[in-house]
Amino acid sequence: MTTRRDPFGPRVGSRIGSSGVGGAEYRRAVADNWHSIGLPPDALAEIEAAGIVLPDLDVVRRYRLDRVREQLRELDYAGIVLYDPVHIRYASDTTNMSLWTAHNPCRYLWVGAEGPMILFDYGDAAFLAGHARLVEEVRPATQWMYELSGIEMDRSLRRWSAELVSVVEEHGGGNRRVAIDRASPDAIHALEGRGLELRNGGEVMEVARSIKSPEEVTLLRAATVVTDRSLDAMRAALEPGITELELWAVLHSENVRRGGEWLETRLLSSGPRTNPWFQEASARVIEDGDLVAFDTDLIGPFGMCVDISRTWIAGDRPPNAHQLDVFGRAEEMIHHNMAMLCPGITFRELTFDTFVPDVEEFRHYTTQFHGVGMADEWPMIVYPDTWDQSGWDGVVEAGMVLCVESFVGRWGRGEGVKLEQQVLVTDTGAELLSSYPLGLR
């Protein structure tokens, strides 16, 4: 059964988007139970105090949908089927249990190169798309994952594939080339068995997401304010005697109470656990003089990702010579490599011409740069010693938002330092998005 937009009732978000989103207008929409993840008053006040005026969200939605359709037309695809909840949100600005649906493929979106956009949602949840004016139709999703369909999975796959093929035949203009971002082998076989030519949806979405509009950048700035204020609370809580988990929980709590959504990782470590990198927060008690390194990996308001890293020192003890040495190298790497960013520079140049401490003496991170927007994104720019294995070339463009990465820790001994800055590539270079200090204190 098809659910049209009309049964949603009043467009609870209809005040948003007519002439921009002023603070009072935004508050009225939230008070009217606008079915889109919004901001609490305190967070909105912090954002406004930073001089940020939230953009017209309908402009953001239109830009993103246009970006997806531009890629579909460029690649000559009839459309794309999206399961990744971040991809669904980018194209339609709809959500439904984002983390749960990230590992339970139970809702999906069809975006046609020439239209329409049809959301197949989980449960009786059409109302969740009430604010999403560009979603032309909402239908109940057909469930083929084993958890929901059990021994009748094949029957569910036949029904699911038949409905999608019907959409392609109705709206694809005879084109049977369709992208899909993720699916099980059974689902792929079901679609191919009905004559569709499947293509990689990751390429479509990553390239579409790589160039941010001015309005998207404003949303990133708002999420950065939320992150910076959350880091203030986290820094105030850092005292010898607190555990890594307790400190990490401050960041998570402060983000959520300001309208943020989740943290992608648990990357916070202290003292000897800072080297090598990628140890997750533990019950270790932080001691006086320990380095404490963390990566925010934060999904904030509007689903925007703020991915910055800091390394602090706990307590009143001054940093020792080793701590100052590795911090200085990591900081030099950040400043030097960030200064290289400009439109036209190639991924290869950003691999081989950057400043990197001697890899025979120091460990390094997995990437030197990576894209960011609604999560970590394309491109991922690696190190010279991993170029042959996982590097590729490309060109940096204005409008990209990139993270500049650094981890420095000696092989076999001593603490490590993790630093990371998030920048907007402009016509004249790199603009730092977070004003949070980089220092140990």
Protein language model regions, located:
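Active-site neighborhoods and metal-handling regions in enzymes and metal-associated proteins
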Residues: M1-R441
